[in-house]
Curated annotation (Swiss-Prot):
Protein name (record): 2-C-methyl-D-erythritol 2,4-cyclodiphosphate synthase
Gene, per the UniProt record: ispF
Family (UniProt): Belongs to the IspF family.
Upper lineage: Bacteria, Pseudomonadati, Pseudomonadota, Gammaproteobacteria, Alteromonadales
Reactions listed under catalytic activity: 4-CDP-2-C-methyl-D-erythritol 2-phosphate = 2-C-methyl-D-erythritol 2,4-cyclic diphosphate + CMP
Taxonomic source organism: Shewanella oneidensis (strain ATCC 700550 / JCM 31522 / CIP 106686 / LMG 19005 / NCIMB 14063 / MR-1)
GO molecular function: 2-C-methyl-D-erythritol 2,4-cyclodiphosphate synthase activity; metal ion binding
Length: 159
């Protein structure tokens, strides 16, 4: 069996008058995230982790923010594309661990929905997907509620 590990990180600031979408789930909040796509910072970090595990660059290479085709793009579509690239090389998800770093909004009420969406998009067992959230104790840009940061680690395996 061959395994590959990928790490993804992404940050977006608050400020768009649109829904806040995280893991494909609408999370009630006063503002959305600034981005060329739909701004789903979680799915961007996961996509980067998958691409990194496969040595395929990053989402900026595959979906440049200078390309009008990706303006307002659904990040679930982007994630599924990245995962399809891994699957085409014979790899499948072993597990996924995500950390959402945000002072606000509270993520706990939405975590299970997020896991379900990820399991569906990655054709995986929800038991292989972990999503957790933490704050920075009011320190830094996330602590000042200026934006959200996300780290994702993915294990892909090929039999």
């Amino acid at each position: 069996m061959k395994i590959r590990i990928g790490h993804g990180f992404d940050v977006h600031k608050f400020g768009e008058p649109r829904p806040l979408i995280l893991c494909g789930v609408e999370v009630p909040y006063e503002t959305g995230l600034v981005a060329h796509s739909d701004g789903d910072v979680v799915l961007h970090a996961i996509s980067d982790a998958i691409l990194g595990a496969m040595a395929l660059g990053d989402i900026g290479k595959h979906f440049p923010d200078t390309d009008a085709a990706y303006k307002g793009a659904d990040s679930r579509v982007l994630l599924r594309h990245c995962y399809a690239l891994a699957k085409a090389k014979g790899f499948e998800l072993g597990n996924l661990d995500v950390t959402i770093i945000a002072q606000a909004p509270k993520m706990a009420p939405h975590i299970e929905d997020m896991r379900q969406v990820l399991a569906a998009d990655l054709n995986a067992d929800v038991a292989d997907i972990n999503v957790k959230a933490t704050t920075t104790e009011k320190l830094g840009f996330t602590g000042r509620k200026e934006g959200i940061a996300v780290e994702a680690v993915v294990l892909l395996s090929r039999q």
